[in-house]
A protein has these predicted regions:
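Residue-level signature of catalytic and energy-coupling elements of molecular machines
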Residues: 15, 21, 40, 62, ...
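Conserved Switch II/interswitch segment of TRAFAC-class P-loop GTPases
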Residues: 57, 63-68, 77-129
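Conserved catalytic-core segments of large NTP-driven translation/proteostasis enzymes
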Residues: 136-219
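Alpha-helical scaffold elements adjacent to nucleotide-binding pockets in ATP/GTP-utilizing enzyme cores
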Residues: 21-24, 96-103, 129-137, 161-169
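Conserved G1/Walker A P-loop phosphate-binding module
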Residues: 1-63
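Signal for well-folded cores of large energy- and translation-related assemblies
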Residues: 26, 30, 34, 38, ...
Length: 219
């Protein structure tokens, strides 16, 4: 099986449907924290595996869209190679849409697929205007010309097209280097009873195996 270590990261304004899209693509609810479910928004990063056409796989990280959790968004994007930018057709380009795109560009993420979500809520005319706005928004950025795909997590429209577009980009994206020193940016820390502090992240270089001694920096 062709298993990629390439990571896809969601981006976009709060309530534009990032978590719902990830759920439709993977079958996994990325919002696992009790507070996330109670408040209906993503606070920490959710992780899942995306099955791609042709038998491949890629990791997918759902990052927060709310401005209060922008530091979590940055942490989640450090290992991302492909962006899945979510723009709601009934709302258009919003402040966090712009902010997230700038952050992704600064972090060196060079590939992007735009999901024009919630198209089931708008009429054909508004849908086309939203598509044109999204394409125009990308002009003058590293993501100009990226595909803009209408999608609905409710009806299922566009889900397979999104999956195919991501598969094409992932297939062209080299995975992180397997040689050299093992490096893993710490993206989350949590405590587990009986284990203590547990660090989470995605390797960007090298390999590690059970029993290896790792150094945490800065010390």
């Amino acid at each position: 099986m062709n298993v990629h270590r390439v990571m896809i990261g969601t981006a976009g304004h709060i309530d534009h449907g990032k978590s719902s899209l990830v759920r439709a693509l993977t079958g996994v609810d990325p919002d696992q924290l009790k507070e996330e479910k109670e408040r209906g928004l993503t606070i920490d990063m959710g992780r899942s595996v995306l099955e791609l056409p042709g038998g491949g796989k890629a990791g997918i990280i759902d990052v927060p869209g709310h401005e209060k959790f922008i530091k979590n968004m940055v942490a989640g994007s450090t290992s991302v190679a492909v962006a899945l930018l979510v723009i709601a057709a009934d709302d258009g380009v919003m402040p966090q849409t712009r902010e997230h795109l700038e952050i992704l560009s600064l972090l060196g993420v060079r590939k992007c697929v735009v999901a024009l979500t919630k198209v089931d809520l708008v009429d054909p005319e508004l849908r086309e205007l939203a598509r044109q706005e999204a394409a125009s928004f990308l002009e003058g950025t590293p993501y100009a010309g990226s595909p803009v795909i209408p999608v609905s997590s409710v009806t299922g429209e566009g889900i397979e097209e999104i999956r195919r577009a991501l598969a094409g980009i992932v297939g062209e994206t080299p995975p992180p280097r397997a040689e050299g020193l093992f490096r893993l940016p710490v993206q989350r820390v949590f405590r587990k009873e009986g284990f203590g502090s547990v660090l989470g992240g995605v390797p960007v270089a090298g390999r590690a195996k059970k029993g290896d001694l790792l150094e945490v920096l800065p010390g």
